[in-house]
Regions:
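Acidic metal-coordinating catalytic centers involved in nucleic-acid phosphodiester chemistry
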Residues: 74, 79-186
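Short, surface-exposed loop/strand segments
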Residues: 1-101
């Protein structure tokens, strides 16, 4: 069972990003999670970062794509945003924001049901580490242990449950929640 079964209807990219940022705030509060707004010149290919070297980027399909089209969109999004880690103009942004050496780049998607994106993530990891090896002075913001990790909604079951079931919400999510399913916390 997927945690997405508790969310009714289509989730927009903005709603997915808002939900992911809330989840990262909860999970990485002790690591001082900092969100990055895409306003004022862009987000540098990340939605936020922690002080222990985790950055994340969200992606939600714009519509119900075929498996092939969905993979193509995910692959292209990952390639574009990981590519920003290697471009001098984005490196400057990351350093100006105080992003520490990046150990993990999380690609956060609603569902992970295509092994090709895992393979592509490994290809991108190798490319980033090869670039770092070829020019270590330029890529000091990349850890020697750099990893690309695929995360999906089910990885944040606890955080999403807390967000959805919170009795006193001081935030607004653009989501409809199904109330006919009972959560199993075991």
């Amino acid at each position: 069972m997927s945690v997405l079964q508790f969310i009714e209807g289509y989730m927009s990219g903005n709603a997915w990003e808002d939900l992911c940022v809330m989840c990262y705030r909860m999970r990485y509060q002790d690591e001082h999670y900092t969100p990055i707004s895409a306003a004022q010149g862009g987000d540098g290919g990340i939605e936020g970062f922690t002080q222990n070297g985790i950055v994340h980027q969200c992606y939600c399909p714009e519509k119900n794509y075929s498996d092939e089209d969905n993979y193509t969109h995910m692959r292209d999004k990952m390639t574009k945003d990981i590519g920003k880690l290697l471009k001098p103009e984005y490196i400057k942004k990351l350093k100006d924001w105080g992003v520490p050496s990046i150990k993990e780049w999380h690609f956060v998607i609603p569902e992970q049901n295509d092994s090709r994106i895992v393979k592509h993530a490994e290809t991108k990891r190798k490319e980033v580490l090869a670039a770092k090896k070829s020019n270590p002075k330029l890529y000091t913001h990349i850890s020697d242990e750099f990893k690309v990790i695929i995360k999906c909604a089910d990885d944040f079951l606890l955080e999403i449950s807390r967000i959805v079931l919170a009795p006193h919400k001081d935030y607004h999510l653009n989501l409809a929640i199904r109330d006919a399913i009972t959560l199993d916390y075991t």
